[in-house]
């Protein structure tokens, strides 16, 4: 899915003159900070589409030839800096015409509304007038009004680029069924003490390990049919957590993607490769988790538990919980544990997963970590 940044032209990309017509080369001047901001957004995966009202373009008062020269030069300047526009959409009507193709109308947007490859949740509109914001509202996307002396507004280009490209990776998932009501809220870019309440104290303690050792803010609230047994509550919590991870990561641009032993791990065999996953000891127990946010859910578990349950958590539901996370998040997880104490073994599994997640979700740049073009 590709996000689109729709941009106005006059007053947004280039400074608008007093007569509102850029019909001569000497009138052409770029808006401050527009190029570095758009380069940042390009690197974050955005494509750009110009949507502009040009009153009476092609009439005697505004000949097409007077428009084309400065406009082509503007496009060449942007292209020379690595900024290409997917399309330039111009409405040439007068305001009195009330044409559906004139902003804030969205008549020019029909092909885009039919394009299922567009990430509308991340798409946005930037302009200097209230009609640009109304255009964004009609498209049901976010609108940014650039700050100008004439039309007001609150944003500059640097702030817009930061808001869109560096947006916090958050998710709020509410999963309601006849058996459970699960609420998961997380913020992958904020550290906070985890908060969990599922009605199963030992399970709460394990969920806290994911947020604490994963290095992100995590809140989980669950109400389930515990009068029947624990299965639905634990399973649906895993599904909701997996969905929240998937939503917060978005297109996964810039993340580490993989979680495994770092080169500096004291638990790796000398000269070994990180194929055994993130290895974590807990007294006599050792667990390892290797994971990949590939978009292809797959779960492999190697380990045994001697006890039927630890606290109020059935041990048979430990691997089932991790499988549920994988199914909902598109995660490939290999989890291995060995030891004597089942409490230690369960807790080590959760901590190993958390530390592997910490690596995989870490931002390392802006590139998409795949050669396929999508994850």
From Swiss-Prot:
Gene3D superfamilies named in the record: HAD superfamily/HAD-like, Imidazole glycerol phosphate dehydratase, domain 1
Cofactor: Mg(2+)
The protein's annotated pathway: Amino-acid biosynthesis; L-histidine biosynthesis; L-histidine from 5-phospho-alpha-D-ribose 1-diphosphate: step 6/9; Amino-acid biosynthesis; L-histidine biosynthesis; L-histidine from 5-phospho-alpha-D-ribose 1-diphosphate: step 8/9
Region feature Imidazoleglycerol-phosphate dehydratase, mapped onto this chain: 169-375
GO cellular component: cytoplasm
EC number(s) recorded for this UniProt protein: 3.1.3.15, 4.2.1.19
Molecular function per GO: histidinol-phosphatase activity; imidazoleglycerol-phosphate dehydratase activity; metal ion binding
Catalyzed reactions: D-erythro-1-(imidazol-4-yl)glycerol 3-phosphate = 3-(imidazol-4-yl)-2-oxopropyl phosphate + H2O; L-histidinol phosphate + H2O = L-histidinol + phosphate
Main localization, broad class: cytoplasm
Pfam family for this entry, one: IGPD
Gene Ontology BP annotations: L-histidine biosynthetic process
Region (Histidinol-phosphatase): 1-168
Disulfides per UniProt: none
Active-site residues from the entry: 8, 10
Residues the record lists as binding Mg(2+): 8, 10, 128
This protein's UniProt keywords: Amino-acid biosynthesis, Cytoplasm, Histidine biosynthesis, Hydrolase, Lyase, Magnesium, Metal-binding, Multifunctional enzyme
Membership in a protein family: In the N-terminal section; belongs to the histidinol-phosphatase family.
Record protein name field: Histidine biosynthesis bifunctional protein HisB
The organism of origin for this protein: Xanthomonas axonopodis pv. citri (strain 306)
Gene: hisB
């Amino acid at each position: 899915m590709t996000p689109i940044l729709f941009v106005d032209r006059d007053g947004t990309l280039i400074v608008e003159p007093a007569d509102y017509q850029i019909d001569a080369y000497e009138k052409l001047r770029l808006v401050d900070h527009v190029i570095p901001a758009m380069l940042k957004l390009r690197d974050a995966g955005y494509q750009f589409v110009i949507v502009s009202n040009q009153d009476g373009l092609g009439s005697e008062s505004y000949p097409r030839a007077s428009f084309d020269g400065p406009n082509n030069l503007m496009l060449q300047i942007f292209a020379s800096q690595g900024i290409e526009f997917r399309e330039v959409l111009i409405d040439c009507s007068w305001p009195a015409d009330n044409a559906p193709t004139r902003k804030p109308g969205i008549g020019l947007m029909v092909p885009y509304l039919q394009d299922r490859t567009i990430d509308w949740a991340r798409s946005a509109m930037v302009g200097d007038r209230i009609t640009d914001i109304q255009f964004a509202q009609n498209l049901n996307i976010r609108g940014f009004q650039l700050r100008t002396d004439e039309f007001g507004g609150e944003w500059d280009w640097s702030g817009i680029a930061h808001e869109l490209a560096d947006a916090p990776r958050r998710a709020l998932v509410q999963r309601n069924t006849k058996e459970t009501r699960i609420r998961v809220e997380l913020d992958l870019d904020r550290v906070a003490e985890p908060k969990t309440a599922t009605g199963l104290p030992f399970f709460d303690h394990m969920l806290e390990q994911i947020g604490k050792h994963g290095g992100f803010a995590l809140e989980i609230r669950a109400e389930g049919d515990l009068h029947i047994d624990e299965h639905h509550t634990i399973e649906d919590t895993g599904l909701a957590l997996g969905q929240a991870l998937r939503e917060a990561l978005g297109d996964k641009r810039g993340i580490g993607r993989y979680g495994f032993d770092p080169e500096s791990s004291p638990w790796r065999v000398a000269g070994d490769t990180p194929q055994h996953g993130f290895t974590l000891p807990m007294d006599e127990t050792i667990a390892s988790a290797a994971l990949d946010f590939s978009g292809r859910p797959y779960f492999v578990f190697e380990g045994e538990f001697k006890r039927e349950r630890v606290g109020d958590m059935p041990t048979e539901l430990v691997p089932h919980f991790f499988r549920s996370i994988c199914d909902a998040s598109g995660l490939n997880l290999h989890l291995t544990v060995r030891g004597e104490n089942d409490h230690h073994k369960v807790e080590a599994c959760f901590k190993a997963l958390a530390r592997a997640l910490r690596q995989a979700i870490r931002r390392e740049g802006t590139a998409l970590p795949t050669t396929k073009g999508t994850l």
